[in-house]
UniProtKB/Swiss-Prot annotation:
Pathway: Pyrimidine metabolism; CTP biosynthesis via de novo pathway; UDP from UMP (UMPK route): step 1/1. PANTHER family: URIDYLATE KINASE, URIDYLATE KINASE PUMPKIN, CHLOROPLASTIC. Gene3D superfamilies: Acetylglutamate kinase-like. It catalyses: UMP + ATP = UDP + ADP. It comes from Nitrosospira multiformis (strain ATCC 25196 / NCIMB 11849 / C 71). This is Uridylate kinase.
């Protein structure tokens, strides 16, 4: 049996990924397929942590641009990530996976508070840990939360699951001649503003030498190929 390239990963899922082709909310078929992909790598012995966004329900930055106080909007966005985390946990339960949700905002009747030691123990026990509510602070994105939790969990790599199969020189939806990077440095991604992640998240990963892989969650078995070290998506490293 081939050994996975990574022992412990952090998967960053955007809220938009849960929508599928819908305009809002959570598409059941999509979330079940994502869970099936996570189950496959978990069964390979890979320890999986997940940071989930909330843009399918509420986007703080957009609302602040429309006149809402930015901090208030960001807290609402954090609550949206808790809703997504619960939906993901429920789908995992139905698929026979054992998971735990830890939130950076305390909602004790619904989810556990974030406690680093417990999260690491859950991972070591083979449970999937879903991190909700970002960093718990406004003005920080869930991408930054993914970088932060990745470092705290001592993961081997952060995997950013998107709708695009990697990082391109320009937007491939606009420019059909855009070329996909196979490998990319953090410095280049930051300097050229390639929209891989926000600059704070990229800088954290760069400074801690934590590699990042960007791939499409909508490509069948792409997550497994990434975990096995096969050529898939774009690798961003120091």
């Amino acid at each position: 049996m081939t050994i996975p390239a990574y022992k412990r990963i952090l998967l960053k899922l955007s809220g938009e990924a849960l929508m599928g082709d819908d305009s809002y909310g959570i598409n059941r078929d999509v979330i079940e397929r994502i869970v099936a992909e996570i189950a496959e790598v978990n069964q390979l012995g890979v320890e999986v942590a997940v940071v989930i966004g909330g843009g399918n329900i509420f986007r703080g930055m957009t609302s602040s641009a429309e006149g809402m106080d930015r901090a208030t909007a960001d807290y609402m966005g954090m609550l949206a990530t808790v809703m997504n985390a619960l939906a993901l946990q429920d789908a995992m339960r139905r698929a026979g996976l054992v998971s735990r949700v830890q939130s950076a905002l305390r909602i004790d009747q619904v989810v556990e508070p974030y406690i680093r030691g417990k999260a690491i123990r859950y991972l070591e026990e083979g449970k999937i840990v879903i991190f909700a509510a970002g960093t718990g602070n406004p003005f920080f994105t869930t991408d930054t939360a993914a970088a932060l939790r990745g470092m705290e969990m001592n993961v081997d790599i952060v995997l950013k699951a998107t709708k695009v199969d990697g990082v391109y020189t320009t937007d491939p939806k606009i420019n059909p001649d855009a070329e996909r990077y196979q490998r990319l440095s953090f410095d280049t991604a930051i300097a050229e503003n390639l929209k891989v992640m926000d600059a704070t998240a990229l800088t954290l990963c760069r400074d801690q030498k934590l590699p990042l892989k960007v791939f499409s969650i909508f490509k069948a078995e792409a997550l497994r190929r990434v975990v096995m070290g096969e050529e898939e998506g774009t690798l961003v490293e120091v």
